[in-house]
Design a protein with these regions (language model features):
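A cross-kingdom feature that marks ATP-driven nucleic-acid transaction machinery
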Residues: 1, 18, 24, 33, ...
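Pre-Walker A adenine-sensing motif
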Residues: 2-16
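Conserved glycine(s) of the Walker
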Residues: 30
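Short glycine-rich substrate-engagement loop in P-loop NTPases that contacts/grips substrate
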Residues: 53-85
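Conserved P-loop NTPase "ATPase switch" module shared by AAA+ and STAND
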Residues: 80-98
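Structural recognition of the conserved hydrophobic beta-strand(s) that form the central parallel beta-sheet
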Residues: 88, 112-118, 139
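Short regulatory helix/loop adjacent to the ATP-binding pocket of P-loop NTPases
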Residues: 104, 121-137, 151-153
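Interdomain hinge/linker elements that couple catalytic modules in large macromolecular machines
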Residues: 142, 146-303, 309, 317-318
Length: 381
C-alpha cells in the first residue's frame, strides 16, 4: 500500500478524540486505502481485531444494511463493552437517514467513528445540523507529485515522471498500470462512475448529453474566469440552448462530487470577496486527458491547476486575487496570513524582452505586503 503520510498522521492525531472523523474526496482518491492503513496502524499498536468494525457500503457483503436502523443494530451487536471500538463506515451516504445511526453510536463513550464519502452531500443538510461541532472533515485528494514520486524507487528523470503525472493523472491505482489503453480505461471508469452515479442519479438529471457538453466546456476552460451565465450564453450561441439555472445545477453537482474545485475572487485592496467570475480547477488533470484527448492544452493553466491543488492540500483557503484591473493567480490564506502567488509556465519572451515578467509582477508590486518571488526556470530573482 502506498502510504499517504499526511492523511494518516491526521487520523492518528484525532484518534480517540470525541469527534467523528469524516474523510471526503472524489472516488478512487484513496479513502478506503487510508482506512486500511490506519487499521494496520491500530493493530500494530495493540488494538484487537474484535475492536475494529469496518463496513464498505458498496460491497455486496453489506447490501442487506439498507436503512439506518439495521446499520445501527448490526454495529451495536459487535461492540466490545469493556474497551474502545473503532468503527469505519465507508461510503455510508447512500443509506437513508444514516446520520441517525452515526449519532446513535457517537453518544456511546466507547465508539471512535470514521466515515468516508465521495459527495459533499455527506456533510450537507440534516447531518451538518445534527453533528454540528462534533466532526472534523479531512479533505482528501488524489496524489500530490511528492506522493506520486514516493512510489518509485528510482527518483531520477523527474521531467519524464512529471510529464506522466500531468498526462495520466494522480489517482493512486494509475501507478499499477503501464499500458496507456489500460490507464484510459481506468480513467473512463472513474469519470463514468462520478458522472452517472454521483451526479446524474443523485440530481435526477434527464439530459445527460447536455451535462456532458457542460463538463467538456469546463474541462477545456480550467483556470479561466467562468460563470453559469457565460457558459449558458456560449452554448446558446452555438445552438445548444441551455438555461442559466440548469448550468447552475450542473456546476453545483460537479463541485459536490469533488470533480471540480471553485476559487472565488478576492479584492485585495478592498479586502472583500467577490461573487462573479470565479475560476474552476479539476481534481485531477488526467481526467482532462481522458475526456479531451490530445487537444492542445494551455500548460500555464495546467500548472496553475496543480499549484491550486497543492495549496489546498496544505490547508489554505484559496482565492483568485483582484488588484485594480490586474489579477493575482492565487491569494492563499492560512491561519489568517495571506500569501500571493503568480503562476506562469515561463516568463521568457521569444524576443528576450521582459514584457511577460513585468505583467506578472505588476499586481504583486502594488500590494503593500512583503513579496517573495520564485521563478522555477531561473531559480530566483
Amino acid at each position: 500500500l502506498l502510504v499517504r503520510k499526511d492523511y494518516l498522521e491526521t487520523l492518528m492525531r484525532f484518534k480517540d478524540k470525541q469527534l467523528i472523523k469524516v474523510v471526503t474526496g472524489i472516488r478512487r482518491c484513496g479513502k478506503s486505502t487510508l482506512f486500511d492503513l490506519f487499521i494496520n496502524h491500530l493493530e500494530s499498536n495493540g488494538v484487537s481485531k474484535k475492536n475494529i468494525i469496518k463496513i464498505n457500503f458498496e460491497s455486496p457483503d453489506y447490501f442487506e444494511l439498507q436503512d439506518w436502523l439495521s446499520v445501527y443494530k448490526y454495529i451495536k451487536e459487535k461492540l466490545s463493552s469493556d474497551s474502545m471500538n473503532y468503527i469505519f463506515l465507508d461510503e455510508i451516504q447512500n443509506v437513508p437517514d444514516f446520520q441517525k445511526a452515526v449519532d446513535g453510536l457517537f453518544i456511546m463513550k466507547n465508539c471512535d467513528i470514521y466515515i468516508t464519502g465521495s459527495n459533499a452531500y455527506l456533510l450537507s443538510g440534516e447531518l451538518a445540523t445534527l453533528l454540528s461541532g462534533r466532526y472534523v472533515e479531512i479533505k482528501m485528494q488524489p496524489l500530490s507529485f511528492k506522493e506520486y514520486l514516493s512510489a518509485y524507487d528510482d527518483k531520477s528523470d523527474l521531467p519524464s515522471k512529471y510529464r506522466k503525472y500531468i498526462q495520466f493523472g494522480s489517482f493512486p491505482y494509475i501507478l499499477q498500470l503501464s499500458e496507456e489503453k489500460d490507464i484510459r480505461s481506468y480513467l473512463e471508469g472513474i469519470y463514468n462512475t462520478v458522472v452517472l452515479k454521483d451526479i446524474v442519479a443523485r440530481r435526477k438529471i434527464a439530459d445527460v448529453g447536455m451535462l456532458e457538453k457542460v463538463i467538456r466546456f469546463m474541462f477545456d476552460n480550467i483556470g479561466n474566469p467562468t460563470s453559469a451565465t457565460n457558459i449558458a450564453n456560449t452554448m446558446t450561441s452555438t445552438r445548444q440552448k441551455i438555461s442559466y439555472h440548469t448550468v447552475e445545477n450542473y456546476l453545483s453537482a460537479l463541485l459536490d462530487s469533488f470533480i471540480f474545485y471553485k476559487a472565488e475572487r478576492y479584492d485585495v485592496k478592498g479586502k472583500q470577496y467577490l461573487s462573479t467570475n470565479a475560476k474552476y480547477y479539476l481534481c485531477d488533470i488526467g481526467l482532462r486527458y481522458y475526456l479531451l484527448g490530445t487537444k492542445p492544452a494551455d500548460f500555464g493553466h495546467i500548472l496553475e491547476n496543480i499549484v491550486f491543488l497543492e495549496l489546498l492540500r496544505r490547508g489554505n483557503e484559496v482565492y483568485v486575487g483582484k488588484v485594480d484591473d490586474s489579477e493575482i493567480d492565487f491569494v492563499a490564506i492560512y491561519n489568517g496570513e495571506k500569501t500571493y502567488y503568480q503562476v506562469a509556465y515561463t516568463v521568457i519572451d521569444s524576443d528576450n524582452s521582459e514584457k511577460t515578467l513585468t505583467r506578472e509582477l505588476k499586481p504583486l508590486k502594488s500590494i503593500k505586503d512583503n513579496i517573495n518571488v520564485i521563478d522555477n526556470h531561473n531559480n530566483t530573482f
